[in-house]
Amino acid sequence: MSNDPTHQFQIHKIVPIEIGGIDFSFTNASLFMVATVACAAGFLYFATSNRGLIPGRAQSVAEMSYEFVASMLREGAGSHGMKFFPMVFSLFMFVLTANLLGMMPYFFTITSQIVVTFALAIFVIGTVLVYGFYKHGLGFLNLFVPSGVPGALLLLVVPIEVISFLSRPISLSIRLFANMLAGHITLKVFAGFVASLGSLGALGVGGALLPLAMTVALTGLEFLVAFLQAYVFAVLTCMYLNDAIHPGGH
């Protein structure tokens, strides 16, 4: 149903593909993931292909994005964290572009799918684990032993630290997924009020003014949320990478 606020999140198969009983179909979510990568890469290529001493608007945005993420990574993970800049910058641009594309009419918001955000979160935590053990060996386990804690309390503190670490991909993915899902549902509900009241004639148009104003305000807020959620995802990624670089630093 067109008035169903959750209809916009439904997955539809575009190219059905099944191999060995496993569904590998190319869906609308797959299409917009490809579109997200293409848009982000295309913008950065366009913005930097004709660089000048006096940057244009596109080049300025690209350079600001670069410096923004680089500064975030230095503050969150130190100078040694810059080796992860390509990863963090790619994640930031992917999430931001996906969020912004999802604001366009009839576009699909891939970050409103928990499987997408959870996959991104697992990638981040997996990188932390692989690098942590590669760089520090079993010394990485010092991450779960906070400095200054009396030995008698370690039996209580260590399990709490382990559970806290294991919950990171869950909290990281749900935070992004829930914010995008809730925001788009709210927008759809208010837009539905506007359409329904507007169809009732002059009286309905008058009654639709408040929902219309709310829709405009919420749209502006959602653009802000689109950036903030990409920022939060990148900041938390930097913090988690810092644990891999300095496992005994907390």
From Swiss-Prot:
Write out the GO cellular component annotations.
plasma membrane; proton-transporting ATP synthase complex
Q: What SUPFAM superfamilies is this protein classified in?
A: F1F0 ATP synthase subunit A
Gene Ontology molecular function: any one: proton-transporting ATP synthase activity, rotational mechanism
Tell me if Cell membrane is a UniProt keyword of this record: yes
- Any transmembrane segments, and where? 29-49, 84-104, 114-134, 143-163, 189-209, 216-236
Task: Tell me where on the tree of life, at the top rank, the source sits.
Answer: Bacteria
Keyword Transport carried by entry: yes
The places in or outside the cell where this protein is found are: Cell inner membrane
Q: How does it sit in the membrane?
A: Multi-pass membrane protein
| InterPro entries documented for this protein | ATP_synth_F0_asu, ATP_synth_F0_asu_AS, ATP_synth_F0_asu_bact/mt, F0_ATP_A_sf
Which keywords fit this entry according to its UniProt record? ATP synthesis, Cell inner membrane, Cell membrane, CF(0), Hydrogen ion transport, Ion transport, Membrane, Transmembrane, Transmembrane helix, Transport
Query: Into which family does the record put it?
Result: Belongs to the ATPase A chain family.
How does the annotation summarize its subunit structure? F-type ATPases have 2 components, CF(1) - the catalytic core - and CF(0) - the membrane proton channel. CF(1) has five subunits: alpha(3), beta(3), gamma(1), delta(1), epsilon(1). CF(0) has three main subunits: a(1), b(2) and c(9-12). The alpha and beta chains form an alternating ring which encloses part of the gamma chain. CF(1) is attached to CF(0) by a central stalk formed by the gamma and epsilon chains, while a peripheral stalk is formed by the delta and b chains.
The UniProt function text for this chain reads: Key component of the proton channel; it plays a direct role in the translocation of protons across the membrane.
The protein's name in its UniProt record: ATP synthase subunit a
Protein's organism: Allorhizobium ampelinum (strain ATCC BAA-846 / DSM 112012 / S4)
